[in-house]
Amino acid sequence: MFRGLNPIAVDAKGRIAIPARYREPIESEADGILVVTIDTEERCLLIYTHPQWEQIEQKLENLPSYHPASRRIQRLLIGHATEVELDRSGRILIPPVLREYAGLGSMVMLVGQGKKFELWGKSQWETAREDWLAEELPKGDDLPPELRSLSL
């Protein structure tokens, strides 16, 4: 499981160093191969281990191709999906088109989200986080059923 916030510098070639604590699970589960694609809801990138991405890709391919929303999601997620491999230094190269989409500069935030990572520009992450914290959360009956029983 990937969790936690990780500020990371982007080098001149567009590479980021995956934190050491994640490298062994990525190597053992996916032979060091990750898949990077766009998030269609936020201007960030999604990073999956290769086996995890294959499951998602299969679900995307099973969507009805005659439905415009399904085709749009397939085109965006599968079309932008790029395999990247950890190098000997534990770095991955984020392709320029994906860096541009997410507005990634010299500092990024790698955000663990369980089975995947999100990769945000540092300032975009900080702005989004502050916006989320400032939002008034629904209460009681306005909460989705899945959240009503969640106790933290």
Curated annotation (Swiss-Prot):
SUPFAM superfamilies according to UniProt: AbrB/MazE/MraZ-like
Superkingdom, taxonomy of origin: Bacteria
Alphabetical list of CDD domains matching this protein: MraZ_C, MraZ_N
SpoVT-AbrB domain span: 5-52, 81-124
Keywords carried by this UniProt record: Cytoplasm, DNA-binding, Repeat, Transcription, Transcription regulation
Keyword Transcription regulation: yes
Pfam families xrefs: MraZ
One record GO biological process: negative regulation of DNA-templated transcription initiation
GO function terms (MF aspect): DNA-binding transcription factor activity; transcription cis-regulatory region binding
InterPro entries in UniProt: MraZ, MraZ_C, MraZ_dom, MraZ_N, MraZ_sf, SpoVT-AbrB_dom, SpoVT-AbrB_sf
A GO cellular-component term linked to this record: cytoplasm
UniProt keyword annotation of Transmembrane helix present: no
Compartments where located: Cytoplasm, Nucleoid
Major subcellular site: cytoplasm
The family this protein is said to belong to: Belongs to the MraZ family.
Subunit-structure text: Forms oligomers.
Name recorded for this polypeptide: Transcriptional regulator MraZ
Organism: Coxiella burnetii (strain RSA 493 / Nine Mile phase I)
Lineage of source species: Bacteria, Pseudomonadati, Pseudomonadota, Gammaproteobacteria, Legionellales
